[in-house]
């Protein structure tokens, strides 16, 4: 009898799983004291219904709208400072006096003329619009005046030409202003009514299309008639303001009147009285004051004279004669400052910030073993006394000629000459080659010259500086060599490599190998200040500025600042027409430290810029001269030095300079031989960090002489046996990606046996990387000479391809 077998449709009962339904005690034991996340109720989580969400959104919109309206009412109103407008013509055909005359509308309000040197300025009071404007002007070629006045202007009014918009000078001015940071701006066209009616529409269309590249989605206004000027004033009054971060957290002031009281001891130094309206933040007398272009100073007291331009003057009846609506302010500035004088605040010596910018180093407490300048000078004198060496020279050689004969025992120079020493052989070769080429070219020009030469060529040649052209050609060649063979140097034959590169070290990995940022610091690091945590200090200072109530002059007050120990040259510059602008410094901003700035090469400039070359910096509200180091902008703890400012990537410029809290814009200029400042790079301030390590790399190269399976004999990297043994622990690499080490030296001429992780090719090159930390030079100079008005150069700075080979 067959056994019964279950079919496929037999019922399968679910197995009992005892671990699923646990009791409370077992769950607590398994949780080991951990508590589950409690779900919040709808009321506790403050979840709003759809109606409440709409109501809340409408309230937020209303608050933002009220904040914008309050800002508009305060700027130019009776309780705020005048609305400062900077008028900048962007083309040489624009008539600036005509535009300023149109803005002085007699029907709109009262006009107070104020002549500040060469700059035209006036105050316009309009009780009907409840607004007052302060108009100033600047030519686009006057670089310092435009940039300084744009720092404090509430609105910039750009005047455009109806046919071209702006010329080369105006385009250069716009590039600088965009890099520094633009406040609120308005575009106006002057002269379009002078065109025929048929061409006016076409001109406006072409101009709008051309302006879209710089100012997308911006409306063009007209400025040819009095009615159009009135519409422009309404636009300026109702326009939403754009803020600049670096000035909103500081108190600043544009000087309307200046007086100087010489000191009894020294006539060249005295007390400077600056009168103007406080802007930005509350001005405290115990803070330091930075006068743009002149330095940092202390304040004695702040006076509060009466407002010379009230929006609604009391006790003055309106004039019946409409011609009397224009009132010319011809009173003395000193009388304005002393009228209705009231002392607002005096400096407290216990709370006033010090002008100390550097730490006075104590040589007895330093832990660094770096030699001082006196020890270096003594060592040089000792070497000079003991450097009498007997040399074999040809017969008839004088002692002076014998000094030029190279000897194998000469040592390398100091650290400051390492850039020159690294590329000495390349430079000597290039100089000889350039001299030979220049002499051949001169002979060829002399042989082929004819009497019928063009006069235009002679005039063109007179503008060319041959020495400057030769230096520029040499720089182009060095930059080209650096691009083709980055960081490669030739091992000197007259100096032992272990002596020449004694300050360098090898690293197994540039990214992960440790490097102590506090070792072998230079003597200049004893003079600077460093924060324990720069980010936290910056946040706490900004929070104090925004939340804490500061005692002093409120925003919108007309005040007179008594600034002590000011040189008389500041007043002379003001009387010559240079605007005087003062910024209140935040704590620690007068102290020296190491600033790191992220910069990118300006596309309009192609001249090579070498590291440690003197440049002019516009950093926030400061400008100064310094010699920066360029390094790669990476997230690692070590950053490779770049010998040139490259155009294809952003780099970090490192300099010694006074502390500035970011955000702050950075502009780099280079002064030409004719005194003109050329824009090199633009960027922003990244950090104030002396511990940021800039590492210089040198690459020694060798040639494989004999190749085996994984072994090779390499020559030309070193030239004696001792150097091979000295650099034996350093890892080797090749351009084709092989890795290896030195096994042993062969002979006494620098040949060495090396092992690699693969077979070498005959066309491969063996390389050795050596690293050394470098520091910027202390070349900080707060004095920057006034630039010559900018003009586009007629001579192209490009180098022909034949000269680069």
UniProtKB/Swiss-Prot annotation:
Disulfide bonds: none annotated. Residues 1-67 are annotated as: Disordered. This is Pre-rRNA-processing protein TSR1 homolog. Required during maturation of the 40S ribosomal subunit in the nucleolus. Belongs to the TRAFAC class translation factor GTPase superfamily. Bms1-like GTPase family. TSR1 subfamily. The gene is TSR1. Keywords: Nucleus, Ribosome biogenesis. GO terms for molecular function: GTP binding; GTPase activity; U3 snoRNA binding. It comes from Pongo abelii. It is found in: Nucleus, Nucleolus. Residues 81-242 form the Bms1-type G domain. GO terms for cellular component: nucleolus; preribosome, small subunit precursor. Residues 46-55 have a biased composition (Basic and acidic residues).
């Amino acid at each position: 009898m067959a056994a019964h077998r279950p079919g496929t449709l037999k019922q399968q009962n679910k197995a009992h799983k005892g671990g699923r339904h646990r009791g409370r005690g077992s769950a607590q034991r398994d949780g080991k004291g951990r508590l589950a996340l409690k779900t919040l109720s709808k009321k506790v989580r403050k979840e709003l219904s759809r109606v409440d969400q709409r109501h809340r959104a409408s309230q937020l919109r209303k608050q933002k709208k009220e904040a914008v309206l309050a800002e508009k009412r305060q700027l130019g109103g009776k309780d705020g400072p005048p609305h400062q407008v900077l008028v900048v013509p962007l083309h040489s055909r624009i008539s600036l006096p005509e535009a300023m005359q149109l803005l002085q509308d007699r029907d709109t309000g009262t006009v107070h003329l104020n002549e500040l040197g060469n700059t035209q300025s006036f105050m316009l009071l309009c009780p009907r619009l409840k607004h007052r404007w302060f108009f100033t002007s600047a030519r686009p070629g006057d670089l310092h005046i435009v940039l300084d006045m744009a720092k404090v202007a509430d609105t910039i009014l750009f005047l455009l030409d109806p046919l071209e918009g702006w010329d080369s000078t105006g385009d250069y001015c716009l590039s600088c202003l965009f890099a520094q940071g633009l406040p609120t701006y308005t575009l106006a066209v002057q002269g379009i009514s002078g065109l025929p009616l048929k061409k006016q529409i076409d001109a406006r269309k072409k101009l709008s299309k051309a302006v879209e590249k710089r100012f997308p989605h911006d409306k063009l206004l007209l400025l040819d008639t009095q009615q159009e000027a009135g519409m422009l004033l309404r636009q300026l009054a109702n326009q939403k303001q754009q803020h600049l971060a670096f000035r909103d957290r500081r108190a600043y002031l544009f000087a309307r009147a200046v007086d100087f009281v010489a000191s009894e001891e020294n006539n060249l130094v005295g007390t400077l009285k600056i009168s103007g309206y406080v802007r930005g933040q509350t001005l405290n007398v115990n803070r330091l004051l930075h006068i743009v272009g002149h330095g940092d100073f202390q304040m004695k007291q702040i006076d509060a004279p009466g407002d010379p331009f009230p929006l609604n003057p009391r006790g003055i009846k309106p004039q019946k004669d409409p011609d009397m609506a224009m009132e010319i302010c011809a009173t003395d500035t000193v009388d304005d400052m002393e009228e209705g004088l009231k002392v607002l605040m005096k400096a407290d010596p216990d709370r006033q910030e010090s002008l100390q910018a550097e730490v006075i180093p104590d040589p007895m407490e330093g832990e660094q073993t770096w030699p001082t300048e006196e020890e270096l000078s003594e060592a040089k004198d000792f070497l000079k006394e003991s450097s009498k060496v007997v040399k074999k020279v040809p017969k008839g050689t004088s002692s002076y000629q014998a000094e030029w004969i190279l000897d194998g025992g000469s040592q390398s120079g100091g650290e400051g000459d390492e850039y020159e020493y690294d590329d000495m052989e390349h430079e000597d070769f290039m100089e000889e080659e350039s001299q030979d080429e220049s002499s051949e070219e001169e002979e060829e020009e002399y042989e082929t010259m004819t009497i019928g030469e063009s006069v235009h060529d002679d005039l063109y040649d007179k503008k060319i500086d041959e020495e400057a052209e030769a230096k520029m050609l040499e720089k182009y060649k060095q930059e080209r060599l650096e691009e083709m063979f980055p960081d490669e140097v030739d091992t000197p034959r007259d100096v032992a490599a272990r002596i020449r590169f004694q300050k360098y070290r090898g690293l197994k990995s540039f990214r992960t190998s440790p490097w102590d940022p506090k070792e072998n610091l230079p003597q200049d690091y004893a003079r600077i200040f460093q924060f324990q945590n720069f980010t936290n200090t910056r946040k706490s200072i900004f929070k104090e500025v925004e939340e804490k109530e500061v005692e002093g002059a409120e925003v919108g007050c007309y005040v007179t600042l008594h600034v002590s120990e000011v040189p008389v040259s500041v007043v002379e510059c003001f009387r010559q027409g240079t605007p005087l602008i003062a910024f209140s410094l935040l704590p620690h901003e007068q102290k020296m430290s190491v600033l790191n700035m992220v910069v990118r090469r300006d596309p309009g400039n192609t001249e090579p810029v070498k590291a440690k070359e003197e440049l002019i910096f516009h950093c926030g509200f400061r400008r100064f001269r310094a010699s920066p180091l360029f390094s790669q902008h990476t997230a690692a703890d070590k950053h490779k030095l770049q010998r040139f400012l490259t155009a294809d990537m952003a780099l970090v410029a490192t300099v010694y300079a006074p502390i500035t809290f970011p955000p702050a814009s950075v502009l780099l200029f280079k002064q030409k031989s004719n005194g003109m400042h050329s824009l090199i790079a633009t960027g922003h301030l990244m950090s104030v960090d002396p511990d940021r390590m800039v590492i210089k790399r040198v690459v020694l190269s060798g040639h494989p002489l004999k190749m085996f399976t994984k072994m090779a004999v390499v020559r030309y990297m070193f030239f004696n046996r001792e150097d091979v043994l000295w650099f034996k622990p350093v890892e080797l690499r090749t351009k084709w990606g092989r890795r290896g080490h030195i096994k042993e030296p062969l002979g006494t001429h620098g040949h060495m046996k090396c092992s690699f992780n693969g077979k070498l090719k005959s066309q491969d090159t063996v390389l050795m990387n050596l690293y050394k930390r470098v520091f910027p030079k202390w070349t900080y100079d707060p004095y920057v000479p006034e630039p010559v008005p900018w003009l586009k150069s007629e001579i192209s700075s490009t180098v022909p391809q034949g000269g680069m080979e």
